[in-house]
Amino acid sequence: MEKWASNQEVLGTWLSLPDSHAAEIAARVDFDYVCIDMQHGMADYQVATVMLQAITLTQKGTPICRVPWNEPGIIGRMLDAGAQGIIIPMVNSAEEAVRAVDATKYPPLGQRSHGPTIIGGRARSLGEEYYLSLIHI
């Protein structure tokens, strides 16, 4: 995440296939990020959760997830599952952008609830500065 914060070039990969082994292999290649594509890829919530865990356990690439649409429930679930970055598509107005960002941050900065499912329960321990929100407009 340090490269993102300092505007350095980052190199990553996208995963469309729902496979935790592919996620682990991609993370071990030493990409800066590995993105699970739930919008156009084949991963559902359960598979994406295992893929995020596989990426996280390598302690290499930042685990990112592109959710299917701008919906607070799925955004929160993927963050709870271990995504350190969320790509939010289908954002068509300033109001929708605010709603998307609110779904990624805990109160008082946003509306995200706390319910981590990730290994070690790190969700809140990382701090807001370690999460990335990318909005497709």
Show which residues each predicted segment covers.
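N-terminal amphipathic alpha-helix/helix-capping segment at the start of soluble metabolic enzymes
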Residues: 1-12, 126-132
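Hydrophobic faces of well-ordered beta-strands that scaffold small-molecule active sites
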Residues: 11-13, 34-36, 63-65, 86-88
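Short, acidic/polar
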Residues: 16-27, 70-77
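Glycine-rich, proline-tolerant flexible connector loops at the mouths of alpha/beta enzymes
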Residues: 22, 29-50
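Acidic (Asp/Glu)-rich catalytic clusters
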Residues: 27-28, 51-58, 79-80
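Glycine-enriched alpha-helix->loop->beta-strand junction motifs that scaffold or abut catalytic
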Residues: 29-33, 80-85, 105-106
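Active-site-adjacent beta->alpha loops and helix N-cap segments on the catalytic face
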Residues: 40-54, 71-74, 92-107, 122-127
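Conserved small/polar residues in nucleotide/adenosyl-binding loops
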Residues: 135-137
